[in-house]
Curated annotation (Swiss-Prot):
Oligomeric and partner information: Homohexamer.
Localization of this protein: Virion
Function: Plays an essential role in tail assembly by capping the rapidly polymerizing tail once it has reached its requisite length.
GO biological process, one term: viral tail assembly
The protein's name: Tail tube terminator protein p142
Keyword DNA-binding tagged: no
Length: 161
């Protein structure tokens, strides 16, 4: 996998691992492994809550001496269905995912080379850039979007001039 795909998968793995019900003093919700990179329509989701991590826009900052920073947007969609107060439930899910992002440290991931070998990498920074919900428009369903910017530095490549 390349950097973009590997970072998104590492985020899926982190959310799934942290919100597995083993830390009831840290998280309101247990996702029961309902986290992936796949998006579904509400009717296609069999178990709620469900979290989907997407690969968004990537921008780069090129610096002297061949250094560069890459900034990858990861839109995280949170789906839920609640019989009582869907907005309150969505806010708890958003709070849990924000906790995962804010307290998890650097995001470690593995990148594959064309020859099949792999090498470990690390995203150095994650920033939550926006959070929005449907504000009850989809009741009894609920949808929230959390946009996260992940900053990483790809391996330095020699300059050919």
């Amino acid at each position: 996998m390349d950097h973009r795909t590997s970072i998104a998968q590492a985020m899926v793995d982190r959310i799934s691992k942290q919100m597995d019900g083993s830390q009831p003093d840290e998280y309101f919700n247990n996702l029961y492994g309902n986290v992936s990179r796949q998006t579904y329509k509400f009717e296609e989701i069999r178990e709620f809550p469900y979290v989907a991590v997407h690969i968004g826009t990537e921008t780069g900052q090129y610096l002297p001496s061949g250094q560069q920073w890459m900034f990858l947007e990861l839109p995280i969609l949170v789906y839920d269905k609640e019989k009582t107060d869907i907005q309150e439930q969505l806010e708890k899910l958003v709070a849990d995912i924000k906790t995962v992002i804010d307290t998890g440290g650097n995001l470690e991931y593995t990148v594959s080379k064309p020859n099949g070998s792999t090498f470990p990498c690390e995203a150095t920074d994650m920033i939550i850039t926006s959070v929005s919900t449907d504000e009850g428009l989809l009741a009894p369903y609920g949808l929230a979007e959390i946009n996260v910017t992940v900053r990483y530095q790809p391996p330095r490549r020699s300059l050919r001039r």
